Amino acid sequence: MSEMAASSAISLLDIKLRRFGVGASNHELRLTKWFKGDQAGAPTRRFTCFADMLAPIRRSEKSEERRFDQKMSAHGAGIKTSSSAVPFASPKSRFLSKQEKFYPRCTPRLTGPQSRDTPPKRDTGIANEKDWGIDLLNENVNEAGTNEDGSSWFRESGHDLGDNGYRCRWSRMGGRSHDGSSEWTETWWEKSDWTGYKELGVEKSGKNSEGDSWWETWQEVLHQDEWSNLARIERSAQKQAKSGTENAGWYEKWWEKYDAKGWTEKGAHKYGRLNEQSWWEKWGEHYDGRGSVLKWTDKWAETELGTKWGDKWEEKFFSGIGSRQGETWHVSPNSDRWSRTWGEEHFGNGKVHKYGKSTTGESWDIVVDEETYYEAEPHYGWADVVGDSTQLLSIQPRERPPGVYPNLEFGPSPPPEPDLPPDQPQ
């Protein structure tokens, strides 16, 4: 009964948090603070165009399809509009609309970026680069504007240079509603240097009129591993959101690492809270590329009244031989603890030793005939990530002058990144 209660509580909490994760109104265009720009000599252009002064922007069929591509829009894809002028006069010109006739009254013709005032969704893992629609401009841009409803927007782009051939190309955009209750910003970038390092990334943040706030970042990196000298691709994502109407919020950190010999590491850390309930989850997978695999999961939750419950397991295998073990546990508000532990030993000959016990007196220790099944290779590996990283791999570094070579000295390992909110003692 304790297990069922614990499982039901976790499911209910998860459903509530999922509901919050996508709870945000999607108003037309709310934009962020005016942006002065940090590029010397790059003036900021601002102006207001009203509906009866704007001509429809002509687009090719491909551009039109992209504008209404729901998948691209959901992940923050940029909208490309044709920069070509109105076509030369033709017999159809006499049918131009009134708006098109008044087109010269509003120049230059700028349109603000599409609003992205929606929090990220929970448990969506690491998106592929194509889902972001990252489109960096080649020229420096610094522009801003005001919409008919009073909302404002900005958009800018540029590049930074550094030692060892370092170059970072970036684009930044954002917007704010007329009263400041809703705002958002989004930054895209690509980095490279002469060592072969390449990086593609996105960072976005915002808030809406309900007081919900969020932050999200995504990165994809190609580099040479300092120990194996093999090419490695790493992808990561961090997401968090907080409710403006109740004591609720969540955080997720996801990562994936791959190398050309099949070595793979994947994992996630998650945390959530809904009023008096909190929950945590961690899991990881490690494949050495030679048949050895390690997988583990640890989940737990608690209430402010003192009830705690959780479940964890781990498996290790190589060449058909390995083990599995786990524990399910529950602690009541008066500190009464119940737990059940279990384990399996797989000998690789069709025999499996199963054992376990619980605090209520259960116990078992048997050997059974049973086939061993486990995943010795990741379902998504090096070949897959290379195929999904075409934009990363196509980043062009700065041209290296003759006789100049990159500095390949690897410095000390960076300190580990801060983890989730402190784990609760069990």
Curated annotation (Swiss-Prot):
What is the documented disruption phenotype for this protein?
Answer: Reduced rosette size, wide stem angles and delayed flowering. Rapidly degraded leaves starch in a nonlinear fashion during the night, so that reserves are exhausted 2 hours prior to dawn; this phenotype is probably due to an altered starch granule matrix organization. Reduced starch content in nonphotosynthetic parts (e.g. cells immediately adjacent to veins, columella cells of root caps, stems, flowers and siliques).
Which spans does this entry mark as compositional bias, Pro residues?
Answer: 412-426
Instruction: Pull one GO CC term from this UniProt entry.
Output: chloroplast stroma
Q: Where in the cell is it found?
A: Plastid, Chloroplast stroma; Plastid stroma
Main location as per UniProt: plastid
Compositional bias of type Basic and acidic residues: which residue ranges?
118-127
Mark out the transit peptide.
1-58
GO biological process: one example: regulation of alpha-glucan metabolic process
Annotated region Disordered: where? 106-127, 396-426
The question of whether Plastid is a record keyword is answered with yes
Task: Tell me which domain of life the UniProt entry assigns to the organism this sequence originates from.
Answer: Eukaryota
Q: Which residues form the signal peptide?
A: none
Does the UniProt entry include the keyword Phosphoprotein? no
- Protein family membership: Belongs to the ESV1 family.
Record protein name field:
Protein EARLY STARVATION 1, chloroplastic
